[in-house]
Amino acid sequence: MSPNIRPFIAGNWKMNGTGESLGELRAIAAGISSDLGRLFEALICVPATLLSRAFDILGGENILLGGQNCHFDDYGPYTGDISAFMLKEAGASHVIIGHSERRTVYQESDAIVRAKVQAAWRAGLVALICVGETLEERKSNKVLDVLTRQLEGSLPDGATAENIIIAYEPVWAVGTGNTATSADVAEVHAFIHHKMHSRFGDEGAKIRLLYGGSVKPSNAFELLSTAHVNGALIGGASLKAIDFLTICDVYRKL
């Protein structure tokens, strides 16, 4: 944790969920009571097909809604894509950009991530930008080099604590059940914090840094209590209300 920075818990449903899944969203909304909600901000990034219905359920009150990706152009002949403006109209306030699955499967470069961040800003969305190394890069002691490249290439000038959130998600831990040690997470988050402070000044020091990579109820307390960890980006555990709420409840103890 970091003093004076409000924690942020984000759930990423990925390509999971149909209308039947909205019952879990209702349960999450009911479980984040007013007293718990004061301790942190919550975001759920549902599939684009559920955004409008999810907004009708949540109303943008206790839980924020986000998209999982957006195109770098505002409109155009891009079959199957979705623009940041479309996400905004459907009820989103945030959008995940540069997730490791997008960077690896779809070969999205830092330049593309940067362009998507700028598109998100044009639409009035907060960009949740993901960075992280592969297992090979970690074994080769290139973690900080990779993060430096990604941070410099993916973040446009003008980043503030109001328009971006950064999630560190080691690629080797995403969806694998493997989790970085708290010492590894502390080292990386301190490094990212330093980079943000150096580039963006005092405003950069306020940018929230989330950890993402097989966060679950059994390891949430250790991870969320780590220095410079201001929250979590949660994948599979966000699909079940009981798991997501158990992670959120950690903030009652910190």
Swiss-Prot record:
<comment type="similarity">
    <text>Belongs to the triosephosphate isomerase family.</text>
</comment>
<dbReference type="GO" id="GO:0006096">
    <property type="term" value="P:glycolytic process"/>
</dbReference>
<dbReference type="InterPro" id="IPR013785">
    <property type="entry name" value="Aldolase_TIM"/>
</dbReference>
<comment type="pathway">
    <text>Carbohydrate degradation; glycolysis; D-glyceraldehyde 3-phosphate from glycerone phosphate: step 1/1.</text>
</comment>
<dbReference type="GO" id="GO:0004807">
    <property type="term" value="F:triose-phosphate isomerase activity"/>
</dbReference>
<feature type="binding site">
    <location>
        <position position="175"/>
    </location>
    <ligand>
        <name>substrate</name>
    </ligand>
</feature>
<feature type="binding site">
    <location>
        <begin position="12"/>
        <end position="14"/>
    </location>
    <ligand>
        <name>substrate</name>
    </ligand>
</feature>
<comment type="subunit">
    <text>Homodimer.</text>
</comment>
<keyword id="KW-0963">Cytoplasm</keyword>
<dbReference type="InterPro" id="IPR000652">
    <property type="entry name" value="Triosephosphate_isomerase"/>
</dbReference>
<comment type="function">
    <text>Involved in the gluconeogenesis. Catalyzes stereospecifically the conversion of dihydroxyacetone phosphate (DHAP) to D-glyceraldehyde-3-phosphate (G3P).</text>
</comment>
<feature type="binding site">
    <location>
        <position position="214"/>
    </location>
    <ligand>
        <name>substrate</name>
    </ligand>
</feature>
<protein>
    <recommendedName>
        <fullName>Triosephosphate isomerase</fullName>
        <ecNumber>5.3.1.1</ecNumber>
    </recommendedName>
</protein>
<dbReference type="GO" id="GO:0005829">
    <property type="term" value="C:cytosol"/>
</dbReference>
<dbReference type="GO" id="GO:0019563">
    <property type="term" value="P:glycerol catabolic process"/>
</dbReference>
<feature type="active site" description="Electrophile">
    <location>
        <position position="99"/>
    </location>
</feature>
<dbReference type="InterPro" id="IPR035990">
    <property type="entry name" value="TIM_sf"/>
</dbReference>
<keyword id="KW-0324">Glycolysis</keyword>
<feature type="active site" description="Proton acceptor">
    <location>
        <position position="169"/>
    </location>
</feature>
<dbReference type="GO" id="GO:0006094">
    <property type="term" value="P:gluconeogenesis"/>
</dbReference>
<comment type="pathway">
    <text>Carbohydrate biosynthesis; gluconeogenesis.</text>
</comment>
<dbReference type="Pfam" id="PF00121">
    <property type="entry name" value="TIM"/>
</dbReference>
<dbReference type="GO" id="GO:0046166">
    <property type="term" value="P:glyceraldehyde-3-phosphate biosynthetic process"/>
</dbReference>
<dbReference type="InterPro" id="IPR020861">
    <property type="entry name" value="Triosephosphate_isomerase_AS"/>
</dbReference>
<feature type="binding site">
    <location>
        <begin position="235"/>
        <end position="236"/>
    </location>
    <ligand>
        <name>substrate</name>
    </ligand>
</feature>
<keyword id="KW-0413">Isomerase</keyword>
<dbReference type="InterPro" id="IPR022896">
    <property type="entry name" value="TrioseP_Isoase_bac/euk"/>
</dbReference>
<keyword id="KW-0312">Gluconeogenesis</keyword>
